[in-house]
UniProtKB/Swiss-Prot annotation:
Active site: 135
Superkingdom of the organism of origin: Eukaryota
Name of the protein described by the UniProt record: Histone deacetylase 3
Family, similarity comment: Belongs to the histone deacetylase family. HD type 1 subfamily.
Inhibition and activation profile: Inositol tetraphosphate (1D-myo-inositol 1,4,5,6-tetrakisphosphate) promotes the histone deacetylase activity by acting as an intermolecular glue between hdac3 and N-Cor repressor complex components.
Region feature (Histone deacetylase): 3-316
Matches recorded under CDD domains: HDAC3
Residues the record lists as binding Zn(2+): 170, 172, 259
Keywords, comma-separated and alphabetical: Biological rhythms, Chromatin regulator, Chromosome, Cytoplasm, Hydrolase, Metal-binding, Nucleus, Repressor, Transcription, Transcription regulation, Zinc
Chain residues that bind 1D-myo-inositol 1,4,5,6-tetrakisphosphate: 17, 21, 25, 265
GO process annotations (BP): circadian regulation of gene expression; negative regulation of transcription by RNA polymerase II; regulation of circadian rhythm
Length: 428
């Protein structure tokens, strides 16, 4: 039976700019959406311009002091916030940039709206490529992430769902989400990531398993450099199958960070776009309500290819290898294809013996789980959002410029892998 897929896209979200030389580029969202449109994938989805999250929404997880700071700070007044900048870890990796709070509001609102639509059975799958900012903590920013839209979305899902499974395939450990739900069995977190050699964020050892009621409801799969499609599949599919069999989640949140692809600027894995997509396809195959989010990904053209391909998998549509012409066509030179070779010369340091050892340890931990913990459901709080949305604009039409209040950053275009912006010679 065909799935109903809701797709959330804010036309302004790709026009925010972390600053010259910064590897995180919201502009990748504009590229992704352009491909989704030009491949005609929007015809297979319900397209929403998302809700913007309020301070109140963000404070469901974050501290009021921190969110109040995010709303008040700007590049023009940040000199007066020296103490707060340090306290909230805002500075180099997480800079203050124009429209910072508005950016957080837009990507968080989309994840929250996706969760609410899943709760109300408006859709079977909700997609927000702008979300998935998994490093943000209750009291501070971290790793290019300010507001943890994933945690806020999961808190909304928990109003209706007794058990939510969180799966993270970003190359970086999903530390902010793990920390938020470390003490509960209502959410099981499963993260596949690079671990060791001081790789950010430095957490995600196999022996971090949760505590108190959440003991054994946190599962980490620490990987080494150079993992390829075959090795990843050897771990991912059996682990996810066992987790779903044991935990029986009623909803799944999947963070699809694309920095686990080969050739990523900040990554050291060797997954192909097809291999990354295979994980999405596998999770979808369980037919459990699914919230799909973005995350990391710093080689912009490959992020757009990856998330477009995964959108096609989620709507069961085969798309051509040749990219359609679009306003961003030149980004995809020289091949202009959906699945270029992204393999690198990084050696796969994940031996079969190492992978089997991880698998064995994980399966032993899973045996410690109570099968599908039951939960006492109290009165369900009212939904944050109600939508009888009949006013959706045609996504094929650009619409008036009034809908695009934030112009594209003039230094957002760049050439090649080492030029981050046309005004910068900083190599990342």
């Amino acid at each position: 039976m065909a799935k109903t897929v809701a797709y959330f896209y804010d036309p302004d979200v790709g026009n925010f700019h972390y600053g010259t030389g910064h590897p995180m580029k919201p502009h990748r969202l504009s590229l992704t959406h352009s491909l989704v449109l030009h491949y005609g994938l929007y015809k297979k989805m319900i397209v929403f311009k998302p809700y913007q999250a309020s301070q109140h929404d963000m404070c469901r997880f974050h501290s009021e002091d921190y969110i109040d700071f995010l709303q008040r700070v700007s590049p023009n007044n940040m000199q007066g916030f020296t103490k707060s900048l340090n306290a909230f870890n805002v500075g180099d990796d997480c800079p203050v940039f124009p429209g910072l709070f508005e950016f957080c509001s837009r990507y968080t609102g989309a994840s929250l709206q996706g969760a609410t639509q899943l709760n109300n059975k408006i859709c079977d799958i909700a997609i927000n490529w702008a979300g998935g900012l998994h490093h943000a903590k209750k009291f501070e920013a971290s790793g290019f992430c300010y507001v943890n839209d994933i945690v806020i979305g999961i808190l909304e899902l928990l109003k209706y769902h007794p058990r939510v499974l969180y799966v993270d395939i970003d190359i970086h450990h999903g530390d902010g989400v793990q920390e938020a739900f470390y003490l509960t069995d209502r959410v099981m977190t499963v993260s596949f990531h690079k671990y060791g050699n001081y790789f950010f964020p430095g957490t995600g050892d196999m022996y971090e398993v949760g505590a108190e009621s959440g003991r054994y409801y946190c599962l980490n799969v620490p990987l080494r450099d150079g993992i390829d499609d075959q090795s990843y599949r050897h771990l991912f599919q059996p682990v996810i199958k066992q987790v779903i069999d044991f935990y029986q989640p009623t909803c799944i949140v999947l963070q699809c960070g694309a920095d686990s692809l080969g050739c990523d600027r900040l990554g050291c894995f060797n997954l192909s776009i097809r291999g990354h997509g295979e994980c999405v396809q596998y999770v979808k195959s369980f037919n459990i309500p699914l919230l799909v989010l973005g995350g990391g990904g710093y080689t912009v053209r490959n992020v757009a290819r990856c998330w477009t391909y995964e959108t096609s998998l989620l709507v069961d549509e085969t798309i051509s290898e040749e990219l359609p012409y679009s306003e961003y066509f030149e980004y995809f030179a020289p091949d202009f294809t959906l699945h270029p070779d992204v393999s690198t010369r990084i050696e796969n340091q994940n031996s079969r013996q190492y992978l089997d050892q991880i698998r064995q340890t994980i399966f032993e931990n899973l045996k410690m789980l109570n099968h599908a913990p039951s939960v006492q459901i109290h009165d369900v709080p009212s939904d944050i959002l109600s939508y009888e949305r009949t006013d959706e604009p045609d996504p094929e039409e650009r619409g008036s410029e009034d809908n695009y209040s934030r112009p594209e950053a003039s230094n957002e275009f760049y050439d090649g892998d080492h030029d981050n912006d046309k005004e910068s010679d900083v190599e990342i």
